[in-house]
Amino acid sequence: MHNASDIQSALVPMVIEQTAKGERSFDIYSRLLKERIIFLVGQVEEHMANLIVAQLLFLESESPDKDIFLYINSPGGSVTAGMAIYDTMQFIKPNVSTVCIGQAASMGAFLLAGGEKGKRFCLPNSRVMIHQPLGGFQGQASDIAIHAQEILGIKHKLNLMLAEHTGQPLEVIERDTDRDNFMSATQAVDYGLVDAVMTKRG
């Protein structure tokens, strides 16, 4: 029985290139990595975050002065995995330009906003959604209280960072992330999550 990721891997197209040494084949994502394009697709979780971080660090080592392009189509996911990607984006020398294709929700929206100012984009029919972090805990009452305190701290920290990236006042961010808040591409520009709607390349 094959799981969804096995099936998806089998469906990834291969690109064949002619070189001086003969033919070379790449999966499509590896070929795009040569153009400094990284795809962040699907749930944000630890394994995916490690791959994104590794690609960011590799591209920095290749050309520290050239922009990196991070294409995002994600429903969100783990805060800690997302913060690993975010911190690396801020840490490395190249500017990271973010582009929303499809959707950038929750942690996906946070990473979209965390791109280099002036280089954050949405495609015309993409959607962006911001909200507060989710938590579900079981166990002893004292442990639940500890986790509740932790998630409130994370919520406040994420709101502060989102306020910095969007230019919105903290109280506006706190109000707007209290529940799921969906935006069109143009609304995301108005809010400050991205800088422009990209309709054509160039």
Curated annotation (Swiss-Prot):
Cellular component terms per the entry's GO annotation: cytoplasm; endopeptidase Clp complex
EC number(s) per entry: 3.4.21.92
Cystine connections: none
Gene Ontology biological process terms, A to Z: protein quality control for misfolded or incompletely synthesized proteins
UniProt subcellular location: Cytoplasm
Cross-referenced SUPFAM superfamilies: ClpP/crotonase (SSF52096)
Catalytic reaction equation(s): Hydrolysis of proteins to small peptides in the presence of ATP and magnesium. alpha-casein is the usual test substrate. In the absence of ATP, only oligopeptides shorter than five residues are hydrolyzed (such as succinyl-Leu-Tyr-|-NHMec, and Leu-Tyr-Leu-|-Tyr-Trp, in which cleavage of the -Tyr-|-Leu- and -Tyr-|-Trp bonds also occurs)
Tagged with keyword Cytoplasm: yes
Subunit structure as annotated in this protein's UniProt entry: Fourteen ClpP subunits assemble into 2 heptameric rings which stack back to back to give a disk-like structure with a central cavity, resembling the structure of eukaryotic proteasomes.
Family: Belongs to the peptidase S14 family.
PANTHER family tied to this protein: ATP-DEPENDENT CLP PROTEASE PROTEOLYTIC SUBUNIT
Protein name in the entry: ATP-dependent Clp protease proteolytic subunit
Source species of the chain: Shewanella sp. (strain MR-7)
